[in-house]
Amino acid sequence: MTAQLIDGNALAKQLRAEAAQRAAALTARGHQPGLAVILVGEDPASQVYVRNKIKACEDNGFLSSFDRYPADLSEADLLGRIDALNRDPRIHGILVQLPLPKHIDSHKVLEAIAPEKDVDGFHVANAGALMTGAPLFRPCTPYGCMKMLESINYPVRGANAVVVGASNIVGKPMAMLLLQSGATITICNSKTRDLAAHTREADIIVAAVGRRNIITADMVKPGAVVIDVGMNRDDAGKLCGDVDFAGVKEVAGYITPVPGGVGPMTITMLLINTLEAAERAAEGAALAA
């Protein structure tokens, strides 16, 4: 068996085309979707991610605002800029690129973003609402993973799903979205004893721990769906995920590649979250008129 690829680039292209149409319709009504991105410091990976997000906005008819600050920016100044963006009616989504410099409290910064503009879904109000099944925004990477499962018409309800990784950004919300779709969830991490005992029982594996080759072929049930969220570098400096792709693709039923899998979907769902924020703002403006 050779796994079928879940092509994140192709799915992202389709979803972005749909988002661009909706954005054009909103813009025609005077409500162009707007995303503000803030980058503090010179982290090379963050610079790449931010460039990709800004380009995605520009390519799909979104207004984009990019604030780039030196690493010694004060926390107070950053909070002041977020406050200004919260009050700017042209901006519907605010994204602060992580990680932040150590002297800045990232929790405080994320909580400063207005929940209705928290398109990353990290604010405690949105994280809490996710628990109840009614979030304003789903975190972009888990949301993209769910769209990938949807694209192959996978029957999530009743499936055994193992999420490897328990971060607030991916692992925890991923587990919650799968649970709400009717899956039976096991959450593991890099220190889980006998990880393979859990993954071998899984119909769906989501690898999001940030460790190269943590999932190998002998750990995967034949026919399973394997979604690789990891972003690592191999010995040659080439981008790779958390999954041993060459081995696992001979066992799994479906697999996402790295690159070209989850990555493009994360940015796509950021656009969709921003679009939905703009649509809500437009509805609110119409009701107030």
Swiss-Prot record:
Signal peptide: none annotated. Keywords: Amino-acid biosynthesis, Histidine biosynthesis, Hydrolase, Methionine biosynthesis, Multifunctional enzyme, NADP, One-carbon metabolism, Oxidoreductase, Purine biosynthesis. PROSITE patterns: THF_DHG_CYH_1, THF_DHG_CYH_2. The keyword S-adenosyl-L-methionine does not apply. GO terms for molecular function: methenyltetrahydrofolate cyclohydrolase activity; methylenetetrahydrofolate dehydrogenase (NADP+) activity. Pfam families: THF_DHG_CYH, THF_DHG_CYH_C. InterPro entries: Aminoacid_DH-like_N_sf (IPR046346), NAD(P)-bd_dom_sf (IPR036291), THF_DH/CycHdrlase (IPR000672), THF_DH/CycHdrlase_cat_dom (IPR020630), THF_DH/CycHdrlase_CS (IPR020867), THF_DH/CycHdrlase_NAD-bd_dom (IPR020631). The keyword Hydrolase applies. CDD domains: NAD_bind_m-THF_DH_Cyclohyd (cd01080). One of its GO terms (biological process) is purine nucleotide biosynthetic process. Pathway: One-carbon metabolism; tetrahydrofolate interconversion. It catalyses: (6R)-5,10-methylene-5,6,7,8-tetrahydrofolate + NADP(+) = (6R)-5,10-methenyltetrahydrofolate + NADPH; (6R)-5,10-methenyltetrahydrofolate + H2O = (6R)-10-formyltetrahydrofolate + H(+). Its EC number is 1.5.1.5, 3.5.4.9. NADP(+) binds at G165, A166, S167, S190. One of its GO terms (cellular component) is cytosol. Belongs to the tetrahydrofolate dehydrogenase/cyclohydrolase family. Homodimer. PANTHER family: C-1-TETRAHYDROFOLATE SYNTHASE, CYTOPLASMIC (PTHR48099:SF5), C-1-TETRAHYDROFOLATE SYNTHASE, CYTOPLASMIC-RELATED (PTHR48099). Catalyzes the oxidation of 5,10-methylenetetrahydrofolate to 5,10-methenyltetrahydrofolate and then the hydrolysis of 5,10-methenyltetrahydrofolate to 10-formyltetrahydrofolate. This is Bifunctional protein FolD. It comes from Ralstonia pickettii (strain 12J). The gene is folD.
